Amino acid sequence: NVLEPFSVTSKSGTLNFSSGDNIIIADGQAKTLRGLDGDDTYFISNLLPKNSTIEVIDTSGSNTIQIATNTKVVKTLWTKDATRLTFEDDKVITINGADNFTFNMGGNVTDGTDGVDLTFAEFALSFGIDDVLNLSGSDTGIITDMYII
């Protein structure tokens, strides 16, 4: 099963969520997704429109970036506390404060699929970035064109 976008463009602006535990599906509804208090799950998949660029900002709670099965990561850029993931069709997500997120690979909060939880350092290592937490600048992942399974 490969998810497909239902919108051809992303909207501008910031979408602020509540202080509860939110499930936030990145589908182009705003340029910036901002969770507030609460333990939020950001569902990242092929639902993003082509050529879209979004940013995730969430500094409170225990938050998770969940990347669905069959989502292809084309390239990655890393700093000690952020990452920029580029998916097929030039879909780009920047996650600020990424060192405080859990990264769930292959899960799907909408159908109960668990997936595998990784720390930021483990997630970076899966793209060939050793010791991401001690980077002094930025580094590009050496593992590219990887499908999440």
Labelled PLM ranges:
Residues 12-16, 21-81, 91-102:
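Acidic, glycine-rich calcium-binding repeat modules characteristic of RTX/beta-roll
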Residues 1-7, 82-149:
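Low-complexity acidic/polar repeat-biased segments
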